[in-house]
Each structure stands twice: as structure tokens, then as C-alpha cells.
Amino acid sequence: MSESKLDVTLWPSVNQLTNPLVKHLVDNAKALRLLVEKLPSGATIIDAGIKAEGGLEAGRLIAEICMGGLGHVNLHSSSTFPHWPWTLSVHSNNPVLSCLGSQYAGWSLSHEKFFSLGSGPGRALAGREELYKELGYKDSADAAVLVLESDKVPPQEVIEKVARDTGVNPENLTFILTPTRSLAGTVQIVARVLEVALHKIHTLHFPLEHVVDGAASAPLPPPAPDFLIGMGRTNDAILFGGHAHIFVKGSDEAAAKLAKELPSSASRDYGRPFAEVFKAVNMDFYKIDPMLFSPAAVTVTAVESGKSFIGGKLDATLLDQSFGYSA
């Protein structure tokens, strides 16, 4: 593995940055329709969609926590997709740290029948993933927060593991639970539209140190009570409706190549709603082409020349099919 060329000396603590955001959730739990519980271990559970109603605003705030306090998530109207007027727009001025170092759901947590992928700042304290060796970044903080796309409270064994791996006492740990079928869960997944672009940039071996800035948007899908359909819709919002604008250093040739390879349509599995693709491989994620997970359209701007390169396309027809619209 090559040594990181990223300059992380001025990178802040994502856990320290999110402490005030987590406090805001707790202090405004009733207004946000959240349930807050202290477990016997001392850990705090924020329910954003299991017993609690949650909602769009809760999901928006949770998405900003996922981004380590380095991202802004906005919900606004848009005419891009006439049947789906609400859009999530995401921006980070440090997309590598915010999206890969914090937001990416890369920490596998399991015990007996419980399984969830942890995302958010707590990952950067544990540093359990190979990704952190590549980034050359490890956080330092006295409190940590993780977001779990789960409809179950993590068992004591998982909480103990997180405390052990992060070096944080359980009473300073917060777990935010956002089931995929919930409104908050839907928002925080679609708000990963910039993150999936960064993850694919990393997969394509484009130099992360050349990524200067980034912004992206994707339509807000209707939630679904069925897990598979709900998961499919949140993925398809990005695969068919996501548009990322990435600002990079380096040659025009490298920027043009990235614009061509980055969109979801560059994948062999593109062309059907995600739920259908998932069923076709017997619900085995590892059989899906990893190049599929990216925004539908991309704009890559080479900041040193000022030239921009366009790749992919938005697909309203496939989006309507996935979201359950019938004329």
C-alpha cells in the first residue's frame, strides 16, 4: 500500500466537531420526534425511526453528523424530476475527510443475530479499516458518535467493542439508529450522494490528494415499508438521480477520464432498479459490480485549467419505475 500523500496536519477532529450537533439532537428530541435513552452501560441511544417517528429534518441533521460536522445538507424543491420535487443537496469543503473519513459506512459491527455497518465520526477514533492507513488520519476525542442503519438497539457486546476500539468510555458514546424504511433513514442514505462519488473515486485509484472540493444532489424518494424496496429506492435516488460536481487538481486528461468512469452508467449492472439487481444475485452484495455505486451524472472541473468534463446522465424513467410512480 502506497504511503498517503494527503496533508492531514490541519485536519480537525470529526468527533469534536460533531459534539454540538449531537447535543442539538438530544436537546431538541421532542421537536424532532426522536427518542433518547440511556442504557445501563451509560451509552446514549437516539432512536430516529424504530419506536420514534423521526422525520426529514432529523435525517438532515443526522446526515450532517455522519459527515463529521464538515458537510452541509439542505432539503429544497427542484424541477429536475417533475414527479419528485424535493431534492437533497450536499456540500463539503473537505470531502475526503468528511465523506471517506467519517460518513462512509465501513465499520462492520456484529454479535449473534445483530449486524450493522457503522458510519460517522466514531470510525475515525477506532481506525479499524484499512482506509485509515491510506488516509493517514486518526482522530482523538473523549466522546464519539456512530450512526447505524438498524431497526434494533445494539447489544451490550457491540457497545463494549465500540468503547474498547475507540478508547471512549461507554457513557460518552452515542448511537443514532436510522432504519432504512424510516424518513430519517431515507434522508441520511440519500445524503450520501457525494460520499458514493468519493468512494468510487477512491476505487478508481484517482489520487485523493487531487480532490479539492465537492458538491452533489439527489431526489428524495418515498420510503417503503418493505426493506428491499426501501433500500432499492434510496440507492436508485443516487444511481439514476444523483449529480456530483467534483473539483480536482491535475491534468485535463485525468479529469476527463474520471468523468467518463465515475457515473453509475459505466457499470455492467446499470439499467434496472437496484431491488431487481439485488434479487438477481440472491441478495449477495459482493456479486454486484462495485462500479455501480455512484451518481448518475458527474461534472469534473479541473481547477488549474478551468475546464469541466461531463459524464453520465439522469434517468427520470428508471427513477419513476423505482419510486413506484405510475401515470
UniProtKB/Swiss-Prot annotation:
GO terms under cellular component: cytoplasm
EC identifiers of the protein: 3.5.4.27
Any matching Pfam family: MCH
Record keywords, A-Z: Cytoplasm, Hydrolase, One-carbon metabolism
Family affiliation: Belongs to the MCH family.
NCBIfam families attached to this UniProt entry: one_C_mch
Protein name (record): Methenyltetrahydromethanopterin cyclohydrolase
Lineage, uppermost ranks: Bacteria, Pseudomonadati, Pseudomonadota, Betaproteobacteria, Nitrosomonadales
